[in-house]
A protein has these predicted regions:
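Positively charged, polyanion-binding regions of nucleic-acid-associated proteins
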Residues: 2-30
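Nuclease-adjacent, charged terminal/linker segments that flank catalytic cores
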Residues: 2-5, 69, 84
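Core catalytic lobe of class I
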Residues: 30, 41-49, 58-63, 67-69, ...
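Alpha-helical residues within the helix-turn-helix
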Residues: 33
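Residue-level detection of the helix-turn-helix DNA-binding "recognition helix"
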Residues: 36, 71, 398
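Accessory beta->alpha helical hairpin/"wing" motif in late/C-terminal subdomains of nucleic-acid enzymes
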Residues: 81-103
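S-adenosyl-L-methionine
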Residues: 107-127, 401-424
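Nucleotide-sugar donor-binding patch of glycosyltransferase catalytic domains
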Residues: 390-396, 402, 409
Length: 424
């Protein structure tokens, strides 16, 4: 039972047993053999007893693991004890409004499609189990903030850098040669009580190189729609400039091999109308030199049509998009908390097209509302997304119902179910 895959399956088997029970409740005596059958094991595993602890008292570890899964499902709000009936548990009607963080060791396939899976659990517990080559890791990490958001984070720079490196390390080991890692990081981090910016980003780039051998390909600027900030230093004290962008740090494990994988022709942008007229009129009309001869113009230059404009390393994408609006509607319908930091689908879409081909595996180890998974799904890439907060992954599942092969784990139906039924 030490296999992470078997532990993941055991957790799912326990949840499903209650879903399939006629009255949604089971005694532990009824539950144990059902789980054994679903796991494809011999019933003898329920009889094996081994010494435990200093006293050496003999216990059945398989039954203990099942009870551990029960307790986890209880924390999710999926299971509850039946009052006055010892050892009897029942499927709850709905999870609550608070965020439910996965306990250490919990790994549940919350939902899946033909192309990907969304897993509820800690990425540190799940990434070690990925057993195939990864072409791209694209993830928006919890930001380094003085006051962490509801979804977590740390305020200590050194701890934050170590946190990122530890979360990435198992993925680096599974990255294909020339594969890419793209990390969305804040540019709005300041020294405590001062208007001077933190240099955590620069420290992180160096640490990722020294510790994990990751080379910096680019620091792509994502310019979104931001409220004025930093509020105190820009709006109150009038010292700082308002921040307008976030980092998307693009890294690779092999800059020589990435030449065979990245292709900017997959993300060409439309030419402007003025450029199209310029080309149609024959391009450059006269000879000229600029910058001490470093730039030369010759008649006829830029007169040949091209399929598009090469993208720059500044992405101008507003935060609102149809996919985000759909997620918000789904979360409200299920009466679940809404994620406080979402990016438009265009951002992961851009990097997935640039750095992968159809059929490649894309991983997001801080899945949030599973934006990376949705972008990968639409682009016919395989995907794995891991999210620590139950309510985020549950609400995200609704957007995938139209995808081929969609399956929502039965235990997830109970999360927010009361609101969905009331409003349905």
């Amino acid at each position: 039972m030490s296999s992470p895959h078997l532990q993941l399956d055991l957790f799912a088997h326990v949840a499903t047993a209650y879903v399939e029970a006629s009255n949604l409740e089971l005694t532990n005596t009824e539950l144990y053999p059902l789980v054994v059958n679903r796991a494809g094991l011999d019933q003898s595993v329920l009889d094996d007893r081994v010494p435990v602890g200093k006293s050496g008292e003999r216990h059945n570890l398989f039954r203990r693991k099942i009870r551990w899964a029960q307790q986890t499902l209880k924390e999710m709000g999926v299971l509850s004890r039946v009052a006055g009936r010892r050892g009897v548990w029942v499927l709850s009607e709905a999870a609550g409004k608070k965020l439910s963080k996965a306990r250490a060791g919990v790994k549940l396939v919350a939902f899946s499609t033909d192309l990907g899976v969304a897993i509820w659990g800690s990425n540190l517990d799940v990434t070690e189990s990925i057993d195939e080559p990864i072409a791209l890791v694209f993830s928006s990490l919890p930001y380094l903030l003085r006051k962490p958001r509801a979804y977590g984070g740390t305020t200590n720079e050194r701890e934050y850098i170590d946190f990122i490196c530890r979360s990435i390390e198992p993925l680096v080991e599974r990255l294909v040669p020339g594969g890419s890692i793209c990390l969305n990081l804040t540019a709005d981090a300041y020294e405590a009580g001062l208007p001077s910016q933190s240099i955590y980003f620069e420290r992180l780039v160096v640490e990722l190189y020294d510790r994990l051998g990751l080379r910096k390909m680019n620091d792509v600027i994502w310019e979104g729609s931001k409220p004025p900030g930093p509020t105190y230093w820009a709006c109150v004290k009038s010292v700082q400039l308002c921040w307008a962008y976030e980092h998307i740090l693009w890294l690779t494990n092999d800059p020589k091999r990435i030449i065979d994988r990245a292709d900017n022709r997959r993300v060409l942008e439309p030419h402007t109308d003025s450029h199209l007229r310029f080309v149609a009129n024959g391009g450059i009309k006269r000879s000229a030199e600029y910058g001490d001869g470093s730039h030369r113009h010759r008649p006829g230059g830029f007169s040949q049509p091209t399929p598009g404009r090469l993208p720059r390393n500044i992405l101008k994408r507003g935060n609102r998009c149809a996919d985000t609006l759909r997620y918000r509607e789904d979360a409200q319908c299920l009466d679940l908390p809404i994620h406080g930091a979402m990016m438009p689908l265009d951002v992961p879409d851009h990097f997935i097209r640039l750095l992968t081909e159809p059929g490649d595996l894309v991983v997001d180890h801080f899945g949030g509302t599973i934006k990376t998974g949705m972008a990968a799904e639409r682009l016919q890439r395989r995907w794995i997304c891991i999210e620590l907060m139950l309510e985020y992954v549950r609400a995200a599942a609704e957007r995938f119902r139209e995808c081929a092969g969609f399956h929502l784990h039965p235990a997830m139906e109970a999360v927010g179910r009361r609101a969905a039924l009331a409003k349905g």
